[in-house]
Amino acid sequence: MANRSRERILKKRDSTPAIQHRNSSAELQNIVKRNRASEKGGAYAVCCAHPIVIDAAIHQAIEDDSMLLVESTSSQVNQLGGYTGQTPAQFAHFVHSAARRIGLSRDRILLGGDHLGPFPWRDEASSRALKKAFGLVRACVLAGYGKIHLDASMACADDAKVVPENIVAQRAATLCAAAEDAFKSLPEGAAAPLYVIGTEVPIPGGELGAGETPVTTTVEGLNQTLRIFKQAFEQRGLSAAWQRVVGVVVQPGVEFGNDFVIEFDPARARSLSAALPRTPALVYEAHSTDYQSPHALAQMVKGHFAILKVGPWLTFAFREAVFALSAIEREMLAAKKRGKLSRVREALDQAMRRKPIYWRSYYHGDEGQLRFARAYSYSDRCRYYWHEPAVQAEIERLRSNLKTSSFPLTLVSQYLPQEYDAIRAGQIEQTAEAIIRHRIQLVLRVYAAACGIRAQPDLFQMPPN
């Protein structure tokens, strides 16, 4: 009997490595309270599963002595693996392992699930898709995710083209019930999940077309959403969970497409900023904030759009650094007339052409235009292909070439002037890894500055208020 009890205890311990500690959840709640009271302070969410981006985000959190909020979407990570091949438990282990290796305390990390709902299974009947969505939410909570975006807004195979908001709210409430049920099985001391609601969300990874303008959420629409969702939660006995709703997704009038960015205009969102509800004590969560200027992001936080999501901009920065290092490699090895060049750009494009599912509906034009878009668009659809073995092999060849033959600072100045300055100032090492990480951190610093976590960012200069 004693041995069985010990086995149960050990099993319980082994099953709790990713349980969310109170510190980061409480910190997000404090950020929300502060922003509501003073229009100051915000949080940015790193919505990316790329290992090098995660590493850069961890380094940035250490540099800023801040919380790190990392979110995975239902398509990236789910109980069936998602396109990254990771379950929520595996993703949590991956993030926590990276943090431990680099030196960030686990209680500084808050994991979030973005667009948790039936989206990955939208081609199935709603009953089947929702059943899988329940499994996804449960898996996230059991893996220690502390921030859950309940998104049941997408139509399934047997739904009308646009799902009525009351149905969306009812489905979101059932997802919440699944999360609450999973939470009950966590060990004592685990922080209760925090929730984000809202139906005015872009398709995960989706953007507007050229010439389209996002419609800013109206105050009437916001109040209707809150009323319908509150009723749906209460009907399922989720009043306590309703008080843990820290964010509602709204459209503040920002978006980006393949070759354009729609900048935040505080005047267009002024009425929404003034309509922050008294209860629950939430702020607005803004999606598709990538490529906004530092000033625009700071103005968003001031207007209570205090949870800023960023994803494609981070892998865009990664791609910029890799392509620039490839150019340095070509110049360097051509001058030395030896060594085999890497073919990162070619391998990436070949991978995209072999499996066009992630970009075909986003890019249009002749083959030349498509090739350009596959590499250089703001929508950054190439982010879905960096993990391909052939692409990884070429990146490794690039890193090996740059490590074997020291690359001249003059070439860094030519292709990566900001990293050149950082190397000259002794801020980073003259290695491919340090350069790539620095490029990503430049973007993260823009968000950290907008959220009041650090001083002015390095990437741009903010105009005065």
Language model features: what each stretch is:
Residues 9-43:
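N-terminal amphipathic alpha-helix/helix-capping segment at the start of soluble metabolic enzymes
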Residues 40-51, 117-131, 213-216, 283-287:
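Active-site mouth loops of central-metabolism enzymes
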Residues 42-47, 68-71, 109-114, 146-150, ...:
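Hydrophobic faces of well-ordered beta-strands that scaffold small-molecule active sites
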Residues 48-53, 83-94, 122-139, 169-171:
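Glycine-rich anion/phosphate-binding loops
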Residues 57, 114, 151, 300:
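Conserved, mostly hydrophobic/aromatic
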Residues 68-87, 150-165, 257-258:
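Glycine-rich, proline-tolerant flexible connector loops at the mouths of alpha/beta enzymes
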Residues 86-107, 111-113, 165-189, 266-280:
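Alpha-helix-loop-beta-strand connector modules within alpha/beta enzyme cores
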Residues 273-458:
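Flexible, acidic glycine-rich loops studded with aromatic residues
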